[in-house]
Amino acid sequence: TTEEVPLNPEPRTECDSDNCAAGERPYAPNIAIENGDTIIAIGVVADVMFVIDXNCPLYCNFCIVADVMFVIDLVYEVGSFEALQQAIDNIMFT
């Protein structure tokens, strides 16, 4: 079963660390994300999940805990949503 992961209901419009909770940092707009990509990501410390897709502007509209480069490397390595979900399950439950 695949759970729907909601986007932040109140998107941030400025890349301002003051908008982030403790331990978070802004989404970095210089990360290469292709238009149309859907990325399901996990927090490295906490099991925080978020989605980046074509409907999200490529600026800081939410804050993240995860290491973005680790996340993107994982996405490209596994290649598909199903494989990514399995990889997430393996990381979170091992």
UniProtKB/Swiss-Prot annotation:
GO terms for biological process: toxin catabolic process. Its EC number is 3.1.1.-. Optimum pH is 7.0. Activity decreases sharply with increasing acidity or alkalinity. Ubiquitous (at protein level). Highest levels of expression in crystalline style followed by digestive gland and mantle. GO terms for molecular function: hydrolase activity, acting on ester bonds. Strongly inhibited by the serine proteinase inhibitor AEBSF. Weakly inhibited by the proteinase inhibitors BSF and aprotinin, and by EDTA. Keywords: Hydrolase. Optimum temperature is 25 degrees Celsius and activity decreases sharply above 35 degrees Celsius. It comes from the Eukaryota. It is an enzyme of class 3 (hydrolase). Hydrolysis of sulfocarbamoyl esters of paralytic shellfish toxins. Does not hydrolyze the carbamoyl esters of paralytic shellfish toxins. Homodimer. This is Sulfocarbamoylase-1. It comes from Megangulus venulosus.
